[in-house]
């Protein structure tokens, strides 16, 4: 455990606290006494999300600038494989015409993968540095284990769904889709509106909560192993779970990307 003075419950609770900023006073929030207000943001989630997004841009830009027509290096080959895989997925699932979808899918896949990958760092490494070197009261390093991050990304996808629906069908067509399906009669407009509204709103909610739930559970298992077992025996469970978690990390990034493509493809269909 990170501290001999902590009980397992204290240790687990400490690692589930975000570093928060109170926007009313622009001061850090005490995790032991959080204010009952909406005006707080998880600045650790924002920081790592932005840093990992910039890392993605820098890595891919550097590879693009150094790309050659000859024999590529190992890193360039890996990047090209990822790009080819994402591009193939877009061609298979998106049947409209848009230059935005493939770059969007690539960004989502790599960005979510990098955020998920933070879960494989030693559970106490960055929080220990933050507490003892920087004097921060709390730190969580997995942005995708924060429901605010995953729902914010899902909200961005939802806005694109609305944009493509209105762009391809027009305001009138989009309105008819909400009010005259599945029952094509004016008397069923209220029922149709409820059914289609729930169906539409469930897309971003399920998209965000699915990623959050899987990553939060994975993070919690690492914390439980570190908090409840002696340090010399943690590797017995940590190593197998970390190996299995690599699959979860990749799969969740892939699922988020695929559902985004599918939802945008459905929105782009002309009726």
Curated annotation (Swiss-Prot):
Annotated effect of mutating residue 210 to K/I/V/E: Completely defective
Impact after mutating residue 217 to R: Completely defective
UniProt keywords, alphabetically: ATP synthesis, Cell inner membrane, Cell membrane, CF(0), Hydrogen ion transport, Ion transport, Membrane, Transmembrane, Transmembrane helix, Transport
TM annotation in the entry: 40-60, 100-120, 146-166, 220-240, 242-262
Stretches in topological domain Cytoplasmic: 61-99, 167-219, 263-271
Pfam families: ATP-synt_A
Subcellular location: Cell inner membrane
Result of altering residue 214 to H: Completely defective
Gene Ontology cellular-component terms listed: plasma membrane; proton-transporting ATP synthase complex
Consequence recorded when altering residue 207 to Y/F: No change in activity
InterPro entries named among the record's database cross-references: ATP_syn_F0_a_bact/chloroplast (IPR045082), ATP_synth_F0_asu (IPR000568), ATP_synth_F0_asu_AS (IPR023011), F0_ATP_A_sf (IPR035908)
HAMAP family referenced in this protein's UniProt entry, alphabetically: ATP_synth_a_bact
Record-linked PANTHER family: ATP SYNTHASE SUBUNIT A, CHLOROPLASTIC
Purpose of the protein: Key component of the proton channel; it plays a direct role in the translocation of protons across the membrane.
Subunit note: F-type ATPases have 2 components, CF(1) - the catalytic core - and CF(0) - the membrane proton channel. CF(1) has five subunits: alpha(3), beta(3), gamma(1), delta(1), epsilon(1). CF(0) has three main subunits: a(1), b(2) and c(9-12). The alpha and beta chains form an alternating ring which encloses part of the gamma chain. CF(1) is attached to CF(0) by a central stalk formed by the gamma and epsilon chains, while a peripheral stalk is formed by the delta and b chains.
Protein name (Swiss-Prot/TrEMBL): ATP synthase subunit a
Organism: Escherichia coli (strain K12)
Taxonomic placement: Bacteria, Pseudomonadati, Pseudomonadota, Gammaproteobacteria, Enterobacterales
Gene from which this protein is expressed: atpB
């Amino acid at each position: 455990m990170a501290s001999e003075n902590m009980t397992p419950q204290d240790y687990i609770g400490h690692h589930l606290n975000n570093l928060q900023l109170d926007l009313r006073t622009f001061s850090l929030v005490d995790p032991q006494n959080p204010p009952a207000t909406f005006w707080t943001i998880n600045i650790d989630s924002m920081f790592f999300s932005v840093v990992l997004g910039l890392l993605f841009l820098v890595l891919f830009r550097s590879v693009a600038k150094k790309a050659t027509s000859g024999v590529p290096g190992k890193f360039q080959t890996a990047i090209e494989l990822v790009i080819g895989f994402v591009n193939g997925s877009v061609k298979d699932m998106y049947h409209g015409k848009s230059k935005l979808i493939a770059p969007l899918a690539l960004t989502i896949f790599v960005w979510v993968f990098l955020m998920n990958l933070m879960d494989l760092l030693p559970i106490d490494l960055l929080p220990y540095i933050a507490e003892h070197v920087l004097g921060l009261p709390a730190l969580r390093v997995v942005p995708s284990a924060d429901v605010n991050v995953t729902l914010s990304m899902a909200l961005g996808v939802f806005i694109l769904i609305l944009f493509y629906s209105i762009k391809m069908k027009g305001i009138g067509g989009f309105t008819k889709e909400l009010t005259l399906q599945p029952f094509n009669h004016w008397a069923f407009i209220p029922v149709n509106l409820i059914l289609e509204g729930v169906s539409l709103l469930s897309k971003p909610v399920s998209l965000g909560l699915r990623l959050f739930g899987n990553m939060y559970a994975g993070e919690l298992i690492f914390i439980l192993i570190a908090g409840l077992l002696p340090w010399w025996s943690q590797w017995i469970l940590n190593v197998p779970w970390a190996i299995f978690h690599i699959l979860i990390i990749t799969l969740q990034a892939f699922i988020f990307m695929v559902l985004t493509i599918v939802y945008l493809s459905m929105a782009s269909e002309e009726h």
